[in-house]
Amino acid sequence: MDATIKVTKPVLKQKDSSAANLVAAIYGLLFVSGEKGLTLAELNRVLRKVGLEKIKAALVQLERKLSLDDESGIEIKKFGHSFRLVTKMEIKDFIHRYLPNKIKNPLNSKTMEVLAIIAYNQPCTRPRINEIRGADSFQIVDDLLEKELIVELGRKDTPGRPFIYEVSPKFYDLFGINSLDELPKVENFDLDKFRQGSFFDSNRYGDD
């Protein structure tokens, strides 16, 4: 007679209704999503039958938990429409030491200039951009569209019916802000620094 005892592993049931499990699930999902992060809509698609209100409440709970935990170097930050896990500013010096070369702005100075013009004047057309710059911006606008940093809103009802542009959610992610209100005020705006990417670095890593 075969005396082998077959051990059956218990089946763990998912408890979508459990607030603790929901917080843990969101934490894990944000972790694996990396720099891309996740929007509420994406979380809602993955966490089926949970509902947006419960997801929002769990996000707030997780955000508060990480924020108040002095032993955690991670927090949740919203970039445009996406939520991401990022390192806290309190440990930025250690991060800099580990990664001595900061992530550099992937945009050149002319592209930064056009992007700044659109951000501060949106909705904005190519003729308006050219007028402000005093130079043609056709190729740069196309590059920004290709990089998905701006989007077309349609055409303006003026002669020539030029396209209208505004910044995209990816713009907010790149500069580490939630809204245009977080951009430097116009009276304090330094276009040269914006061109050089200083604004990009300061918002990603804090002032040195």
UniProtKB/Swiss-Prot annotation:
GO terms for cellular component: cytoplasm. The keyword 4Fe-4S does not apply. Homodimer. Homodimerization may be required to stabilize the binding of ScpA to the Smc head domains. Component of a cohesin-like complex composed of ScpA, ScpB and the Smc homodimer, in which ScpA and ScpB bind to the head domain of Smc. The presence of the three proteins is required for the association of the complex with DNA. Transmembrane segments: none annotated. Its main location: cytoplasm. It comes from Mycoplasma pneumoniae (strain ATCC 29342 / M129 / Subtype 1) (Mycoplasmoides pneumoniae). InterPro entries: ScpB_csome_segregation, WH-like_DNA-bd_sf, WH_DNA-bd_sf. The keyword Cell cycle applies. This is Segregation and condensation protein B. One of its GO terms (biological process) is DNA replication. The gene is scpB. Belongs to the ScpB family. Participates in chromosomal partition during cell division. May act via the formation of a condensin-like complex containing Smc and ScpA that pull DNA away from mid-cell into both cell halves. It is found in: Cytoplasm. Keywords: Cell cycle, Cell division, Chromosome partition, Cytoplasm. HAMAP family: ScpB.
